[in-house]
Structures are given as C-alpha cells and as structure tokens.
Amino acid sequence: MYLQCYINEKGEKVYTTKKESPLGLATESAHPARFSPDDKYSKQRVLLKKRFGLLPTQNAPLQY
C-alpha cells in the first residue's frame, strides 16, 4: 500500500491509500519523484527553460 492523495471540493489535499477518490477520479502519489545526481536530461531542461524565459535569472529581481 502506497500513500496517495487527491484534492477535494474545498481545494484541500486529502491523503488516502485508495487508488480512486470518492468523486471517482484517480489519486496521485503523495511522494515526490526521486532525485538523481546523475541527471541525464539536465542540459535539455536548462535549454528549454532558457528558450521560454523560465530561468530565475530571466525574471524581474525580487523586491525585499
């Protein structure tokens, strides 16, 4: 049994072990994806973020 979660009508995250929410929708895993230091696709990910202006350095500076 793996921990699953879904978003209820109020927008709250609800944790369960069932594969389906009471509304009949599929639940998603409550655990984050594993991080691997041997990331094969990091170069492509950075290139895509640079192309679409999603890098943190391409945003306006934060106002503190």
Swiss-Prot record:
Gene Ontology, cellular component aspect: Cajal body; mitochondrion; nucleolus; ribonucleoprotein complex
Stored Pfam families: Nop10p (PF04135)
Subcellular location, principal: nucleus
InterPro entries from the UniProt entry: H/ACA_rnp_Nop10 (IPR007264), H/ACA_rnp_Nop10_sf (IPR036756)
Subcellular location(s) per record: Nucleus, Nucleolus
Ribonucleoprotein listed as a keyword: yes
Alphabetically ordered keywords of this record: Nucleus, Ribonucleoprotein, Ribosome biogenesis, rRNA processing
Listed SUPFAM superfamilies: Nop10-like SnoRNP
A GO term, aspect molecular function: snoRNA binding
One Gene Ontology biological process: pseudouridine synthesis
Family of the protein in this entry: Belongs to the NOP10 family.
Free-text function comment from the UniProt entry: Required for ribosome biogenesis. Part of a complex which catalyzes pseudouridylation of rRNA. This involves the isomerization of uridine such that the ribose is subsequently attached to C5, instead of the normal N1. Pseudouridine ('psi') residues may serve to stabilize the conformation of rRNAs.
Quaternary structure (record): Component of the small nucleolar ribonucleoprotein particles containing H/ACA-type snoRNAs (H/ACA snoRNPs).
The protein, known as: H/ACA ribonucleoprotein complex subunit 3-like protein
UniProt source species: Arabidopsis thaliana
